[in-house]
């Protein structure tokens, strides 16, 4: 495992990261002796996941593979790569494929990633395929570990107090935001008429379970900032 640059973290963040790594090591040791009857959720051990979504032809499998390679270079926490897609051709063999339900289109595929019925168990760090990773991302897993996290929409560059979310990076526990999916799929057309896109819907659907926002300086837009 690569050495972590301690200078990237505050004192409190470093304590959280050390605790996270210690817990991960203990969990890995536990998993080696765990009997099937002791695995309580879905029969799956808990993992950290990097998730992306590829639908249609806007982004090729190369984008998925490049994102995977970027995470390998810049993450020292054990993870599994997951891609939600309607076409798995060309993906790296280490990437776990989850098929998208039929009928979803464009950014309205995104609510599916919050479903509790995905065949995974643990913590998901979702990234859009146009995200470029420039530094270590361990703290995206360790920041505010008891909450779900996302970033402020990049309208913040023009309106500093802008409260709405940008769904290009979201971290959550599997099943934690299941209602974002179930409330959407109950009447997709009604949601689409009222909300411009998936991140507007995410903001509305989680009003009673608001996100902790990553610091603006951690994730920035090359276009707006």
Can you say where each PLM-predicted feature lies in the sequence?
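Basic, mixed-charge low-complexity alpha-helical segments
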Residues: 7-32
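Residues that flank catalytic or metal-binding motifs in active/ligand-binding sites
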Residues: 46, 77, 93, 110, ...
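N-terminal anchoring/stem segment of glycosyltransferases
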Residues: 27-106, 119-120, 174
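A residue-level signal for conserved active-site and pocket-lining positions in enzyme catalytic cores
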Residues: 81, 114, 130, 170, ...
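Short, hydrophobic beta-strand segments that form beta-sheet elements in well-ordered domains
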Residues: 77-86, 124-125, 148-151, 212
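GT-A fold catalytic core of metal-dependent nucleotide-sugar glycosyltransferases
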Residues: 89-92, 97-99, 111-162, 172
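Catalytic core and acceptor-binding pocket of nucleotide-sugar-dependent glycosyltransferases
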Residues: 174-225
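A short acidic, often aromatic-flanked loop/helix-cap motif at beta-alpha or helix-coil junctions
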Residues: 89-91, 102-107, 156-158, 218-224
């Amino acid at each position: 495992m690569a050495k972590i640059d301690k200078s990237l973290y505050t004192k409190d963040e470093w304590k959280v990261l050390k605790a996270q790594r210690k817990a991960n090591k203990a969990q890995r040791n536990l998993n080696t002796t765990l009997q099937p009857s002791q695995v309580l959720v879905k029969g799956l051990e808990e993992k950290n996941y990097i998730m992306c979504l590829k639908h249609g032809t806007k982004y090729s499998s190369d984008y998925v593979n490049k994102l995977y390679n970027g995470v390998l270079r810049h993450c020292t926490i054990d993870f599994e790569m997951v891609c939600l897609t309607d076409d798995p051709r060309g993906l790296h063999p280490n990437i776990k494929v989850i098929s998208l339900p039929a009928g979803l289109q464009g950014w309205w595929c995104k609510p599916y990633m919050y479903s509790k019925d995905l065949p995974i168990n643990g913590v998901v760090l979702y990234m859009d395929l146009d995200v470029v990773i420039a530094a270590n991302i361990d703290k995206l897993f360790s920041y505010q570990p008891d909450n779900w996290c996302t970033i402020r929409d990049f309208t913040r560059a023009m309106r500093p107090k802008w409260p709405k979310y940008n769904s290009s990076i979201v971290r959550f526990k599997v099943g934690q935001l299941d209602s974002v999916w179930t409330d959407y799929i109950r009447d997709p057309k009604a949601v689409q008429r009222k909300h411009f896109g998936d991140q507007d819907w995410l903001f509305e659907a989680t009003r009673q379970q608001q996100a902790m926002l990553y610091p603006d300086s951690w994730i920035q837009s090359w276009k707006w900032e």
